[in-house]
Curated annotation (Swiss-Prot):
Family annotation (Pfam families): Rnf-Nqr (PF02508)
Subunit structure: Composed of six subunits; NqrA, NqrB, NqrC, NqrD, NqrE and NqrF.
Membrane topology term: Multi-pass membrane protein
Matching PANTHER family: INTEGRAL MEMBRANE PROTEIN OF SOXR-REDUCING COMPLEX, NA(+)-TRANSLOCATING NADH-QUINONE REDUCTASE SUBUNIT E
Catalytic activity: a ubiquinone + n Na(+)(in) + NADH + H(+) = a ubiquinol + n Na(+)(out) + NAD(+)
Family the UniProt entry places it in: Belongs to the NqrDE/RnfAE family.
Subcellular location: Cell inner membrane
Superkingdom in the source lineage: Bacteria
GO cellular component, one term: Gram-negative-bacterium-type cell wall
InterPro entries: NqrDE/RnfAE, NqrDE/RnfAE_oxidrdctase, NqrE
The protein's name in its UniProt record: Na(+)-translocating NADH-quinone reductase subunit E
Its EC number(s): 7.2.1.1
GO biological process, one term: sodium ion transport
Lineage summary: Bacteria, Pseudomonadati, Pseudomonadota, Betaproteobacteria, Nitrosomonadales
């Protein structure tokens, strides 16, 4: 239990996908103008990440890894070369289901997220979560916790950046830094702040 809690905290703070590995930057910078929209995007990423990482774990364990098909009498077959395509297929399917759900039950949020909702399907932070899961050889429970933690960490980062950007609207930002200029600086300073967690091992 302690190891799972440590894995969650590590995924949120120590190995934050946005501020440590700089994954998902396109969406991270584009959607972080308003806290409400950033929060909605963060929830969407949490849901997608929490679902896709453990599902991709099952795909890897029972279909792709070397010897995974022993249950089908095909122990000598190694399908790991299909990993990237398989993970992207799972992610795209989950995102499509989420988009249909939001369009049906939360049209305002669906409209606010716009083109960036389908772009979650090719968000490198989402794919990165599955690739890290395979690289670190997590089991199903660890994959579930890691997916939740990494999604929560990304959501925390985008909501925090949105809060900073909303405050910056009332600040006297030099003309040359307005817009993405000051946003890059703010994100960089946040990333430096998260470096304080880099030495923690849980």
């Amino acid at each position: 239990m302690n190891s799972l809690a440590g894995l969650f905290i590590t995924a949120v703070f120590v190995e934050n996908l946005a501020l440590t590995f700089f994954l998902g930057m396109c969406t991270f910078l584009a959607i972080s103008k308003k806290i409400e929209v950033a929060f909605g995007m963060g929830i969407a990423v949490i849901v997608v990440q929490t679902l896709t990482v453990p599902i991709n774990n099952l795909v890897y364990q029972y279909l792709l890894r070397d010897g995974a098909l022993v249950w089908a009498g095909l122990a000598e077959i190694d399908l790991t070369f299909l990993g990237l395509v398989s993970y992207l297929g799972v992610i795209a399917a989950i995102v499509q289901i989420l988009e249909m759900f939001l369009d049906r039950f939360m049209p305002a949020l669906h409209s606010a997220l716009g083109i960036y909702l389908p772009l979650i399907a090719v968000n490198c932070a989402i794919l990165g979560g599955s690739l890290f899961m395979v690289e670190r050889d997590y089991n199903f429970t660890e994959s579930l916790v890691y997916g939740l933690g990494s999604g929560f960490g990304w959501a925390l980062a985008i909501v925090a950046l949105a809060g900073v950007r909303e405050r910056l609207k009332y600040s006297d930002v030099p003309d040359g830094l307005q817009g993405l200029g000051i946003t890059f600086i703010s994100a960089g300073l946040m990333a430096m702040g998260f470096m304080a967690f880099s030495g923690i091992r849980l």
